[in-house]
Regions:
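Surface-exposed patches in mature extracellular/periplasmic domains of secreted proteins
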Residues: 12-18, 54-60, 124-131
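Well-ordered alpha-helical scaffold segments within catalytic/enzyme domains
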Residues: 3, 40-55, 70, 109-124
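Sec/Tat-exported extracytoplasmic proteins
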Residues: 9-12, 46, 75, 118-121, ...
Length: 170
């Protein structure tokens, strides 16, 4: 739903919250956690909202630039974001015991949509071209070869603490 990403976005990052409890009760105290993969779907929704006129183009570019700038500062592991981040800080929020590093699948969900944004705005005005360039840089910094671990496969996760212990080939 477009409103989840537009109205409900975490204010510092502009990304989608992992969850929203309408009653305001967060037993895990995780109300500031943002989801990388879910934000990818949300970014695609923002782009559709801009194209269809639900979001004014300049406001959409401003939000997408906020997201790109945040992602540049946020924790990354060989260019790949973790499954979750703490929205206010951009620091990794572990998804599980050994899942405290790069999550290639979730990052690719996000990057797919960001690449659509890049293509959509690449020939636009000065701000739009700058946004497209920021996204292009983020994409180029994703070290897919690192996630091969020297093998003929790509792995889902890598952790600076646990290395390849999860070892899920894609």
């Amino acid at each position: 739903h477009l409103n989840y990403m537009w109205d409900g976005a975490e204010p510092v990052s502009g990304l989608a919250p992992e969850r929203i409890h309408l009653d305001g009760d967060y037993p895990e105290k995780d109300q500031s956690v943002v989801t990388i993969g879910g934000s990818g779907f949300g970014v695609a929704g923002l782009l559709v909202g801009i194209e269809r006129g639900f979001i004014p183009r300049a406001e959409g570019v401003k939000r997408l630039t906020q997201i790109a700038d945040y992602l540049k500062r946020a924790d990354r592991f060989h260019g790949v974001w973790p499954h979750w981040l703490y929205g206010p800080t951009g620091e990794v929020k572990p998804f599980g015991q050994k899942d405290n590093g790069g999550d290639l699948v979730e990052s690719c969900f996000l990057m797919q949509s960001l690449l659509c944004v890049r293509q959509y705005f690449r020939d636009g005005n000065e701000q739009e071209k700058a946004l497209a360039e920021k996204i292009d840089q983020l994409w180029k910094e994703m070290e897919f070869s690192w996630y091969q671990n020297g093998k003929d496969v790509i792995y889902w996760h890598w952790s600076p603490e646990y290395n390849w212990e999860m070892n899920f080939p894609l």
